[in-house]
């Protein structure tokens, strides 16, 4: 099962419809975090530290569905925490899929095969498996031996059963570029739809701040890792990959990925949680975005995350015929605007 063309048509129509309505800011992807608890303790993860006081809290199925409805985006990215730990994750996924929204569920794959027994394959559903390198590098990054093998088996099993599968990789300072390239080739050869990639964001709650990569250093890494001649299938759209290489610039549009958590909607964005609100419309105000973004808030200075800039490439492509044609030729609208946690 490959990338559905229906997503390309629906996403394009959705954007044009909102533009006609005169909406300057609106969501492309609902980032849904039904819990923040995880069964791993990755060094670069800010969520399990930031939400330490509510790790036992679950968002109910009905509240998840209401958040998706309030946002209205055609794409839902389920993150966390580890979503498969939610006792009703199958109901959350299946009921959103029943609405014909496209669901991407992030997972470390430890419980993925168990979840497959309750969530059937669908063109509207895709596993996004976290992979940070080949076996030694990945197991080191998640602080547990054997996770790479478990994830690899789960990916193979899911593909064999007809599920859509992608991977998601976070690039940190000091990464082994050759190891990343080998992993991307490995996943491409396994038959995943593509590999998502993004630099790690500098969460202040993470003790080891040397882990995070600067914007300048990240672009040097991506110029090498994203070399098109390697034949790797990347899931991010080609304009965003150009941005990662430093070949183009965009203004952050993180409002396009509103994030719902056990405490409500994160404000202002998926990465920064200065406060939480119960009204998603608060995230689209002019006043709010006068305060955030590169050059406005120092915390945004090194950010290259797809949740802020991949959507920006989509919005701009629709106003630049050359970029739009390139997106169509490379089949990129099927996966455009995806942000994975």
Q: Can you annotate each of these PLM segments?
A:
Residues 2-118, 122-123, 330-333, 341:
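Conserved alpha-helical substructure of the radical SAM core
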Residues 17-21, 243-247, 289-290:
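Short, P/G- and charge-enriched loop/turn segments at secondary-structure junctions
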Residues 26, 265-341:
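Flexible mid-to-C-terminal extensions adjoining Fe-S/redox cofactors in radical SAM and related proteins
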Residues 37, 41, 251, 299-302:
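The −1 position to Zn-ligating cysteines in a subset of zinc-ribbon hairpins
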Residues 59-60, 125-132, 140-267, 271, ...:
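Radical SAM enzyme [4Fe-4S]-AdoMet core and its adjacent flexible, acidic
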Residues 81-82, 198, 309:
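Short, solvent-exposed turn/loop segments enriched in Gly/Ser/Thr/Pro and often Arg
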Residues 115, 137-141:
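Short, charged, surface-exposed secondary-structure boundary motifs
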């Amino acid at each position: 099962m490959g990338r559905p063309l229906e997503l390309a048509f629906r996403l394009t129509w959705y954007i044009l419809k909102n533009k006609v309505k005169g909406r300057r800011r609106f969501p492309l992807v609902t980032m849904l975090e039904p819990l923040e608890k995880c069964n791993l303790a990755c060094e670069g993860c800010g969520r399990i530290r930031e939400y330490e006081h509510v790790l036992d809290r679950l968002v109910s199925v009905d509240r998840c569905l209401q958040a998706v409805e309030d946002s209205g985006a055609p794409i839902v990215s389920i993150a966390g925490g580890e979503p498969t730990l939610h006792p009703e994750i199958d109901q959350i996924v299946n009921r959103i899929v029943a609405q014909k929204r496209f669901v991407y569920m992030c997972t470390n794959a430890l419980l993925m095969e168990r979840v497959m027994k309750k969530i059937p394959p669908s063109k509207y559903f895709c596993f996004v498996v976290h992979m940070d390198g080949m076996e030694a590098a990945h197991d080191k990054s998640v602080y547990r031996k054997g996770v790479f093998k478990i994830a690899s088996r789960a990916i193979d099993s899911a593909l064999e059963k007809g599920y859509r599968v992608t991977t998601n990789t976070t690039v940190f300072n000091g990464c082994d570029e050759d190891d990343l390239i080998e992993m991307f080739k490995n996943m491409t050869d396994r038959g995943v739809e593509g590999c998502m990639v993004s630099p790690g964001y500098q969460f202040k709650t993470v003790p080891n701040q040397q882990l995070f990569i600067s914007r300048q250093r990240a672009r040097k890494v991506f110029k090498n890792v994203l070399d098109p001649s390697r034949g790797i299938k990347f899931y991010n759209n080609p304009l965003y990959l150009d941005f990662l290489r430093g070949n183009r610039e965009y203004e952050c549009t993180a409002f396009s990925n509103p994030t719902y958590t056990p405490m409500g909607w994160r404000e202002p964005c998926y990465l920064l949680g200065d406060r939480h609100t119960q009204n998603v419309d608060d995230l689209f105000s002019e006043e709010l975005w006068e305060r955030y973004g590169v050059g406005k808030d120092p915390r945004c200075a090194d950010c290259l995350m797809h949740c802020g800039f991949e959507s920006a490439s989509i919005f701009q492509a629709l106003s630049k015929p050359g970029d739009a044609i390139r997106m169509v030729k490379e089949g990129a609208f099927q996966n455009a605007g995806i942000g994975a946690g």
